[in-house]
């Protein structure tokens, strides 16, 4: 902290006054000061020089680098001067010099010298604090001492911050207080607050050194306002061209700007400017670690690895920042790495890691060397640690994912996760990254069985990469993309990619040609071109009769219009290749579509035979579970024995599904089967949990309908309605009546649960819509009538204050409609319930419910009439009360206006009386003054004699009291006398008014006395202020 407490504008020739000779002095030329200040100290001691001369000469030695001599002068001053103020300032100056020496020792990494200088600082700073602990200089030095003692310790920084806060509170414009506080805030990462303090310091003194603009630029840089940072540093360079520290920062700006626009034409220009400024700073200060750090990168890019190692050593030796030291070791390791010296490279990387444990690139270097040394286990641990500490490191994730994928026992799940994270980082990265197409294909292969859509995305990226790089695209990649698109339902896109694959297919690859022909036929089949697909299958079978998949697809197409030949062909395929599980699965599906015999189900028999030989065939297990569940649901229960038999069928179905899940834990069809059985047994929570997981795997409306039914049974009506509406919006017109019936049922359950009429109206609406979609369905007709009846009952049962006559009339309409529908359903051929029960329901509604509703309507009419009468009475009473209040307010207003008028007349009368009284008083005073003038003329001689007598008498009294005639009268006494004369004057306020006519004279006298007292108090206050100003002035003179 150069110039912290010393005078920075001292004269070059200092005149030391000689003791006892006021007009003579000794001139000392500061440009030719002796290297030994002992003689100068003797002169100052002999002449008893004031404190400022000791500090001036100490400063002159200090700026010439002779700090020990400066300290010698200040210590001699401590032995000579005895006043506390001088001792405090001299101790503070010595502490400031030791602080600067400690800072230099810290930069040179001389820990012992630094500690010694800091001990000296503490010694002299404590001496200064013992004299004046609240001195701004001492507090500032204590704050700087705390920073140098431990720049990274939070407690030390907090203590230093309290020191600077104290100084700023005591002296709000202290520049060093601003800079110290800003330095601490910057170290804490509070760059905005630090910026404000640096700016306040700059406003206070734009010419201050060190320049606050440097700190302003650093704050702007960390706030990502790099253009503003450049402006601040450029201004520093304009004001002080010799300041090469700023060249480093300006070079850093252009270096960063260049690498933000690597593919831009401005890269070369910005990089050249960066090197120009960095080289200028390096030439002036070749030990600058920041400049060396940037230059080592440039030298490395030129493949001058020896030069890079030398610059890295320079950074390590001259830097006190752990991050810069780690950076130096890292570039040294990279140079050795490129030179093939893996041992030295590993040692350098490890030293970089030891210097800064958060240095990411050194950890990557260690992992790379471990891979080169074939220590894959250690490499895996290293890159796992990197991925945990820095989740945005793309390279670490890629390497770690490849290591897991290429392991002897590959962890595909972890490999997928790591590579997926790496690819997600590519899009968000500001730096351009190149990803090889093989890496995309590898990731697609890892995700193929888990997420088809994601796998297709990676294959598409690989295709885009090859096309953008103008590289050839193989038919295998196009075929794989088409297969995934087919599974995702993107049939037109898959068809187009297969055509492209056939166009680039080499002639000498018949196996791939057969595969593409079959895939193209499958696409034609899905597009509805069954004739084209059938012809394609026939063509394939002509060339390759043993291609079983083509034969199966051909039979499936023929089943749309089956004949005896088709059945024979299916059985022939089964007999010819009964060991093929695909054939057996197809034959089992074929049996499930046939009419089942009551004694034995051929589907169950076929699946059981398959599982005897292939117990892990998942398709057969799921198909067997479906067969058992279908049998249980179709089984009619009339007694407990039959109920137990149906329960056994459900248990068999669950066992089949459970076996399928054991072999394939992610089999969604088996899971859905278990969920359906749980729902049949009213275990809706468990069923919902399973169906929620199955939903993403099976893209089928039936899964959503099952979820909605479970939610409705669990009374989660809002969610159930949302699910059914989603299904309704995505279902074809011919199939919507079932979903509409589900919606009507949910709204009915919700309305009955919450007793809400609007919910039942929604139920009626959806039930009616379902009936409109399928008017011939008697179940839907019954649903409408039932909901209408429930709506009528709910409205009727509501209390009188919660319903209206209109609501009851609407309920009557719904009841009539339901009665009509029930009567109609009795004569339907296949009613949903027995005609007797439906007829009984219609009679009850017609005879009982309708009469109750009619009585309710009559009671509601009477209730509403009574309520209306009460409301009318209340309204009349409110209007009367309002009229009464208005009349009272009007009377009060008139009374107030009359009172104000009377007061105004009285006020005007009193003002006229005061004016007349003033005139009479003025006339009386003029008469008195004329009379007194005559009397004074006559008695002038007499008064003069009396004054002489009083003067002689006052002299006698003053001599008795010890006061001489030459003593001055204090200014305060003189003013007090003036005040006494002013007191005798009578002043009447112009604002004075009489309260009562009868007490006018007495009030006048009280007002005059009060005015005089206030005036006297004001004069005394003014007198005190004057005395205060005089005392301050006298103190400045003394100083």
Curated annotation (Swiss-Prot):
GO aspect biological process, one term: transcription elongation by RNA polymerase II
Keywords: Coiled coil, Ion transport, Phosphoprotein, Potassium, Potassium transport, Repeat, TPR repeat, Transport
Recorded superkingdom: Eukaryota
Gene3D superfamilies: Tetratricopeptide repeat domain (1.25.40.10)
Each TPR repeat, start to end: 51-84, 175-208, 210-243, 251-288, 326-359, 361-393, 437-469, 514-547, 634-667, 701-734, 737-770, 799-832
UniProt-recorded Gene Ontology molecular function terms: RNA polymerase II complex binding
Phosphoserine PTM sites in chain numbering: 930, 932, 959, 961, 964, 998
The keyword Translocase is annotated on this UniProt entry: no
GO terms under cellular component: Cdc73/Paf1 complex; nucleus
Function comment: Involved in promoting potassiumm ion uptake.
Record-given protein name: Tetratricopeptide repeat protein 1
Organism annotation: Schizosaccharomyces pombe (strain 972 / ATCC 24843)
Protein encoded by which gene: tpr1
């Amino acid at each position: 902290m150069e110039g912290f407490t010393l005078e920075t504008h001292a004269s070059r020739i200092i005149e030391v006054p000689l003791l006892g000779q006021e007009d003579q002095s000794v001139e000392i030329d500061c440009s030719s000061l002796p290297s030994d200040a002992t003689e100068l100290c003797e002169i100052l001691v002999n002449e008893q020089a004031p404190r400022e001369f000791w500090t001036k000469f100490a400063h002159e030695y200090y700026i010439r680098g002779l700090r020990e001599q400066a300290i010698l002068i200040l210590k001699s001053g401590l032995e000579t001067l005895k006043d506390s103020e001088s001792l405090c300032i001299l101790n503070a100056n010595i502490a400031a010099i030791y602080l600067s020496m400690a800072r230099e020792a810290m930069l040179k990494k001389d820990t012992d010298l630094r500690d010694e200088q800091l001990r000296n600082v503490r010694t002299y700073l404590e001496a200064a604090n013992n004299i004046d602990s609240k001195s701004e200089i001492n507090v500032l030095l204590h704050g700087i001492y705390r920073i140098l003692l431990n720049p990274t310790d939070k407690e030390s920084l907090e203590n230093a911050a309290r020191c600077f806060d104290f100084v700023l509170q005591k002296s709000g414009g202290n520049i060093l207080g601003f800079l110290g506080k800003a330095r601490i805030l910057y170290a804490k990462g509070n760059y905005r607050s630090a910026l404000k303090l640096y700016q306040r310091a700059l406003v206070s003194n734009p010419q201050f050194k060190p320049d606050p603009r440097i700190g302003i630029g650093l704050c702007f840089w960390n706030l990502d306002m790099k253009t503003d940072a450049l402006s601040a540093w450029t201004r520093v360079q304009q004001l002080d061209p010799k300041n090469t520290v700023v060249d480093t920062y300006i070079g850093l700006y252009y270096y960063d700007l260049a690498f933000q626009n690597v593919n831009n034409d401005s890269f070369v220009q910005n990089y050249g400017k960066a090197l120009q400024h960095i080289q200028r700073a390096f030439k002036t200060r070749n030990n600058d670690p920041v400049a060396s750090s940037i230059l080592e990168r440039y030298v490395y890019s030129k493949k001058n690895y020896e030069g890079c190692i030398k610059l890295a050593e320079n950074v390590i030796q001259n830097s006190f920042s752990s991050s810069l030291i780690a950076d130096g070791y890292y570039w040294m390791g990279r140079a050795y790495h490129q030179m093939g010296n893996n041992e030295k490279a590993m040692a350098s990387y490890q030293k970089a890691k030891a210097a800064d444990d958060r240095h990411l690139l050194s950890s990557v270097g260690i992992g790379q060397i471990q891979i080169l040394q074939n220590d894959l286990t250690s490499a895996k641990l290293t890159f796992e640690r990197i991925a945990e500490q820095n989740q945005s490191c793309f390279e670490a994730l890629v390497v770690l994912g490849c290591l897991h994928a290429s392991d002897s026992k590959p962890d595909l799940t972890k490999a997928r996760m790591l590579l997926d994270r790496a690819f997600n980082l590519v899009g968000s990265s500001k730096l351009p990254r190149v990803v090889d197409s093989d890496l995309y294909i590898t990731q697609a292969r890892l995700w193929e069985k888990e997420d088809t859509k994601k796998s297709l995305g990676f294959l598409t990226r690989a295709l885009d990469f090859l096309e953008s790089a103008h590289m050839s695209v193989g038919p295998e990649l196009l075929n794989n993309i088409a297969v995934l698109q087919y599974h995702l339902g993107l049939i037109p896109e898959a068809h187009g990619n297969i055509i492209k694959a056939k166009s680039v297919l080499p002639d000498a690859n018949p196996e791939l040609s057969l595969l593409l022909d079959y895939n193209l036929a499958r696409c034609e089949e899905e597009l509805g071109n069954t004739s084209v697909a059938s012809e394609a299958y026939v063509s394939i079978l002509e060339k390759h009769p043993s291609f079983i998949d083509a034969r199966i697809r051909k039979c499936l197409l023929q089943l749309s219009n089956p004949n005896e030949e088709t059945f024979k062909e299916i059985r022939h395929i089964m007999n010819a290749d009964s060991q093929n599980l695909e054939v057996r699965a197809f034959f089992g599906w074929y049996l499930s579509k046939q009419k089942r015999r009551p004694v034995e189900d051929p589907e169950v028999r076929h699946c059981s035979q398959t599982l005897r030989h292939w117990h892990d065939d998942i398709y057969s297990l799921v198909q067997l579970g479906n067969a058992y569940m279908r049998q249980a649901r179709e089984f009619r229960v009339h007694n407990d024995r039959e109920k137990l038999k149906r329960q056994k069928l459900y248990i068999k179905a669950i066992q089949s599904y459970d076996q399928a899940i054991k072999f394939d834990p992610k089999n969604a069809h088996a899971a859905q089967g278990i969920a359906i059985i749980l729902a049949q047994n009213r275990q809706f929570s468990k069923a919902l949990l399973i169906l929620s997981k199955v939903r993403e795997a099976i893209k089928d409306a039936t899964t959503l309908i099952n979820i909605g039914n479970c939610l409705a049974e669990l009374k989660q009506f809002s969610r159930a309605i949302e699910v059914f509406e989603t299904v309704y919006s995505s279902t074809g017109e011919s199939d919507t009546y079932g979903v509409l019936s589900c919606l009507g049922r949910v709204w009915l359950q919700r309305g009955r649960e919450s007793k809400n009429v609007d919910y039942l109206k929604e139920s009626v609406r959806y039930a009616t819509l379902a009936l409109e979609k399928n008017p011939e369905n008697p179940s839907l007709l019954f649903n409408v009538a039932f909901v209408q009846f429930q709506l009528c009952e709910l409205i009727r049962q509501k209390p009188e204050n919660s319903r209206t006559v209109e609501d009851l009339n609407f309920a009557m309409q719904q009841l009539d409609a339901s009665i009509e529908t029930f009567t109609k359903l009795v004569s339907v051929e296949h009613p949903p319930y027995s005609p007797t029960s439906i007829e009984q329901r219609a009679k009850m509604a017609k005879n009982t419910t309708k009469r109750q509703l009619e009585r309710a309507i009559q009671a509601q009419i009477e209730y509403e009439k009574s309520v209306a009468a009460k409301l009318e009475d209340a309204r009349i009473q409110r209007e009367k009360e309002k009229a009464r209040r208005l009349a009272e307010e009007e009377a009060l207003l008139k009374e107030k206006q009359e009172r104000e008028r009377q007061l105004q007349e009285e006020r005007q009368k009193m003002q006229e009386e005061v004016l007349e009284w003033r005139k009479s008083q003025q006339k009386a005073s003029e008469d008195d003054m004329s009379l007194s003038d005559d009397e004074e003329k006559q008695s002038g001689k007499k008064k003069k004699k009396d004054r002489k007598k009083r003067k002689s008498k006052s002299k006698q009294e003053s001599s008795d009291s010890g006061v001489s005639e030459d003593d001055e009268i204090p200014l305060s006494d003189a003013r007090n006398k003036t005040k006494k004369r002013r007191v005798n004057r009578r002043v009447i306020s112009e604002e004075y008014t009489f309260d009562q006519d009868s007490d006018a004279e007495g009030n006048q006298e009280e007002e005059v006395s009060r005015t005089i007292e206030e005036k006297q108090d004001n004069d005394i206050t003014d007198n005190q202020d004057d005395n205060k100003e005089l005392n301050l002035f006298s103190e400045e003179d003394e100083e």
